[in-house]
Amino acid sequence: VRAAVNVDLTADGSFRRRPGYRLVKPGEYHSLWRNPVSGQVFVAEGAVLNVLSPDLSLTPVFELDSPEPTDFCEYNGNTYFRGGYYDGKRGRPLGVPTPSVTIEPVAGGLPQGRYGIALTAVNDAGEESGASRVQFVEGTGFRLHIQSNTPAVRAYITDGHGEQLRLAWEMPAGLLSYQITSPAAGDWLTSGGLEPLPKGQIIRGHGGRLYVAKGDMLCFSEPLRPHLWNPGYGFV
């Protein structure tokens, strides 16, 4: 044989016609990936990430920040990609957005003092955001004016002239204002200074953390909080 086109030579020396291919779904697709655990197949069309079904139908699950190719990884039952993850039911952004709040003093039952107040948001999966910037207000009670699109918001306050924040109340985010007039007695705040993990070119999970390569920097999440990182030290 001097020349052969579209022919494979097998181990026993015989010839076999090479399988062909055909167009089954036109479109500008990229970032095709199969989750090795769940078996789900993902493909992006422009900036829209889809789940590809066996019948080749597409189900949009997430809006990427650009039409650039994305990396994937499987970790803790989720499929992660640039800026988000898929939990088997829906796509979600990495990390819950921190709520914004304005505070005004009102008459209440707290001892007169200087109180620190910070808020976190909670999504429908029970995941908590990083805390808002601590604001200090003088008085005996406070009215919070909240802006958040999550199902719930948690308010943390210090003791009068204290520094440690404790949970005072969890309230529906649809409640645009709320008054705190009694001392906090809940859990201590543990998400101060944390932000959603940044987007990058490569994402991997290991040992209770997510790792994101962003340019020449490697960012890593807090342990057992894979969607939040501390920008003060969570990178190399």
Residue ranges and their predicted role:
Residues 1-40:
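N-terminal low-complexity, intrinsically disordered "leader/linker" segments enriched in small/polar
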Residues 25, 55-208, 212-216, 220-225, ...:
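Disordered, low-complexity "stalk" and linker segments at domain junctions of extracellular
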Residues 31, 40-41, 71, 202:
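Short, surface-exposed charged micro-motifs
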Residues 44:
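Segments forming glycine/polar-rich beta-alpha architectures that bind adenosine-containing cofactors
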Residues 50-51:
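Short, surface-exposed beta-strand/strand-loop-strand elements in extracellular ectodomains
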